[in-house]
From Swiss-Prot:
Protein family per UniProt: Belongs to the universal ribosomal protein uS15 family.
GO terms under cellular component: cytosolic small ribosomal subunit
Disulfide bonds: none
Lineage: Bacteria, Bacillati, Cyanobacteriota, Cyanophyceae, Nostocales
A molecular function GO annotation: structural constituent of ribosome
Name assigned to this protein: Small ribosomal subunit protein uS15
GO BP: translation
Self-association state and partner proteins as the record states: Part of the 30S ribosomal subunit. Forms a bridge to the 50S subunit in the 70S ribosome, contacting the 23S rRNA.
Species per Swiss-Prot/TrEMBL record: Trichormus variabilis (strain ATCC 29413 / PCC 7937)
Gene3D superfamilies: 6.10.250.3130, S15/NS1, RNA-binding
Pfam families: Ribosomal_S15
Keywords: Ribonucleoprotein, Ribosomal protein, RNA-binding, rRNA-binding
Primary role: One of the primary rRNA binding proteins, it binds directly to 16S rRNA where it helps nucleate assembly of the platform of the 30S subunit by binding and bridging several RNA helices of the 16S rRNA. Forms an intersubunit bridge (bridge B4) with the 23S rRNA of the 50S subunit in the ribosome.
NCBIfam families: S15_bact
Length: 89
């Protein structure tokens, strides 16, 4: 269920702003989105796993705050990122 180091590196390479970027807002949101998607799949199979559901809600809240920050800083980057990730239809 956890992200492998290889998958994390793929996400970083796809969303990094410059060569050594590992913690920009774009990368953080992409990582959280991947974790949210995996946890959502887990919860569809394990409906009674309430502690994981609580963790999912915390991750969604964190991503929501990061998206709000990105929207304030750069609306163009925000629009590009949400369309690239396929969130907020």
């Amino acid at each position: 269920m956890a992200l492998t180091q290889q998958r994390k590196q793929e996400i970083i390479n796809n969303y990094q702003v410059h060569g050594t970027d590992t913690g920009s807002t774009d990368v953080q949101i992409a990582m959280l989105t991947e974790r949210i998607n995996r946890l959502s799949e887990h919860l569809q199979a394990n409906k009674k796993d309430h502690s994981s559901r609580r963790g999912l809600l915390k991750l969604i809240g964190h991503r929501k705050r990061l998206l709000a920050y990105l929207q304030q800083e750069s609306r163009e980057k925000y629009q590009a990122l949400i369309s690239r990730l396929g969130i907020r239809g």
